[in-house]
């Protein structure tokens, strides 16, 4: 609903924070597709935990939090192609990334047209 109603907004940048909470599977793919379409009209930033949504993105970053001496630290990392495959695989399969989850991640990225050889504009290395 948030994605659909934002189409009428005239702002150049849209930010979605976990717009995909409580969904999965086919619905997640639809949300990812709709976000990608919105990205053709304006800049879209989306926080997601779903690989189906992340795989639709043109660019992907990994955000992580750690706590040191009672202080919470946040880090953000732009993902190059190989790191993106590993992150999608982690999202698919959990902590232990296997050859099978890596292959599944590659297939998901290729199928969505967001990986080299499939029309991607992802950089080959991190900035």
Identify the residue ranges that each predicted region occupies.
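C-terminal lobe/lid and adjacent interdomain/linker elements of RecA-like ASCE P-loop ATPase modules
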Residues: 26-127
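Conserved D-loop-proximal element of ABC-family nucleotide-binding domains
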Residues: 8-9, 21-29
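GG-anchored amphipathic helix commonly corresponding to the ABC/SMC/Rad50 NBD signature/C-loop
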Residues: 1-14, 38
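Short, glycine-/Ser/Thr-/acidic-enriched flexible segments
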Residues: 4, 21, 68
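Walker B catalytic acidic pair
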Residues: 17-18
